[in-house]
Amino acid sequence: MDSKKPEPFDFFIQMHLTERCNLACTHCYQEGPAPREMSLPEIAAAVKKISDTIDAWSQEYDVPFSPGFNVTGGEPLLRNDLKEILRVISDHGFTIFLLTNGTLIDTDISAMLASVPVKGVQVSLEGPEEVHDLIRGRGSFTSAVNGARHLIDAGLTVTFNITLSEINAGYFPDMISLAAGAGVQKLGFSRLVPYGRGSSLIGKMLSPERTRAIYEEALAYRVPGLHIVTGDPLASQTGEAGNMPEGGGFPLGGCAAGISGITVLPDGTLTPCRRLGIPIGNILTDSLREVWANSDVLNALRNKEAYKGKCSECARWSQCRGCRAIAYAYSLSQGRNDFLEEDPQCFIDTGDRL
């Protein structure tokens, strides 16, 4: 009899505390006026509801969960009660990651994050100084790098993350050197989502061939002390995917939307992913269990037969499914409204893994 315990199921909550931000990045997926923000008591109630639901799932299915909270914005450091929010999340046993532009981080904030504790911090960095400042605003590069150094000094694990487009994809080697020189432990990458302000950059999206070339190059780097990571499901389909060293990473189970994660917006609205901004409920008024089980949107995301184009025929569907947010945003740009279309940057053959 096999008594081996099942592996913990990685499940993440991405909680956006605010859509306020001190920057106005050209590729940002946010649009429109900032919504109402949940109060600290409302956030505490939401976190408890999430925790209770995950505990119930674990007992019902006899599978241990490894839940994580990605806390972000907007710029989460604009919340004056951030410390209290993080403590509420930590007290429920969640692993916490903070996603920030890094420009507001100083010694005191770094010490606070380390004391919670926050497990890791992602700082957005789009390339060398002139490229980063073109995308995120003059002076933001220096502030972000200084913020990362404060985090490292406080003993936190730091990831630089670059949003790839034709504006900055050619600078990936520079980012390797920059990240290694700054002493960060990880360098991550994702793709431009042509949504919100980012919709104006649709002409800067990488072609499928360019996407593949950049990903192959990125995952082939071997720099002591620096790990290459990404949440992009397409990365798992590159020829380098099987050669990743320990500490490097990409999603083995494909796009997380509807499968292994959910997003909570500042007012409590639930969506499959922040960049796939289709409301499916509200954490303050709806049962997370009911939303997860019965949402038509989530169930469509889990059904291969509902997908369109290459994704509907692909032998790698269960390991990839493309980025649903990019597929959706691209469909909107073409006058459609379909989150189940094929990923427009897909570079894999439908019948085979590369």
Range-by-range predicted roles:
Residues 31, 72, 124, 190, ...:
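Conserved residues at the C-terminal ends of beta-strands
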Residues 1-7, 270, 275-354:
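Flexible mid-to-C-terminal extensions adjoining Fe-S/redox cofactors in radical SAM and related proteins
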Residues 16, 37-41, 115, 119, ...:
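Radical SAM enzyme [4Fe-4S]-AdoMet core and its adjacent flexible, acidic
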Residues 1-119:
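Conserved alpha-helical substructure of the radical SAM core
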Residues 9, 19, 65, 256, ...:
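Residue-level preference for beta-strand/loop junctions
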Residues 40, 79, 83, 106-107, ...:
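Structural motif corresponding to alpha-helix initiation and N-cap regions
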Residues 20, 24, 28-31, 258, ...:
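Cys/His-rich metal-chelating microdomains
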Residues 33, 102, 126, 192, ...:
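Flexible loop residues that form catalytic
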